[in-house]
């Protein structure tokens, strides 16, 4: 595990890397080119490494104002090119997001307890229905419904449908 962390420190700001370490005495240090070798040599059990988000990490996603439970939910990271958050259209309803410049926030739980709590209580898959009136919070939107309908027509062969899906990024 320490060797894996040393590799992250070596990569530093290059993804996937790490930007900070926290020493056992609680002091936080930024990893710089000048300090990188010193930090790698000093790294022992007890140090914490603040690494970049990686595929599978749990994060909390919300949009202000957080008026109800669905305004803050846990999602799992899938790292893609670019420096933006991306949200599946089926998960937009509880956030009242409509892709017109909505400001969203992402938070990374810092302890094992917080990560477990996020997975158990806040996971999108466990919050499909509104606790207020038992209606769906997550579901297909207009474009997905229309697209599924069009795919169900006999106008496309299976091969053509697969090519369309593949070119749209679904493999």
Task: Indicate where each model-derived feature is located.
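Core mixed alpha/beta domains of very large multi-subunit molecular machines
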Residues: 1-128
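Flexible, glycine-rich loop/tail regions that form catalytic "lids" or insertion modules at the edges
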Residues: 66-67, 130-171
């Amino acid at each position: 595990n320490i060797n894996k962390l040393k590799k992250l420190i070596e990569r530093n700001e290059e993804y996937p890397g790490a930007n900070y370490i926290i020493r056992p005495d609680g002091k936080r240090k930024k990893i710089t080119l000048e300090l990188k070798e010193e930090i790698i040599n000093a790294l022992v059990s007890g140090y914490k490494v603040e690494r970049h988000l990686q595929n599978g990490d749990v994060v909390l996603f919300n949009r202000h104002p957080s008026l109800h439970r669905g305004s803050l939910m846990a999602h799992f990271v899938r790292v893609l090119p670019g420096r933006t958050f991306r949200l599946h259209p089926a998960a937009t309803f509880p956030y009242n997001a409509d892709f017109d410049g909505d400001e969203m926030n992402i938070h990374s739980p810092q302890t094992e307890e917080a990560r477990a709590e996020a997975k158990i209580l806040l996971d999108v898959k466990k919050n499909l229905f509104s606790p207020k009136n038992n209606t769906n919070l997550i579901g297909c939107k207009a474009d997905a419904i229309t697209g599924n309908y069009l795919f169900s027509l006999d106008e496309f062969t299976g091969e053509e449908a697969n090519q369309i899906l593949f070119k749209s990024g679904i493999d």
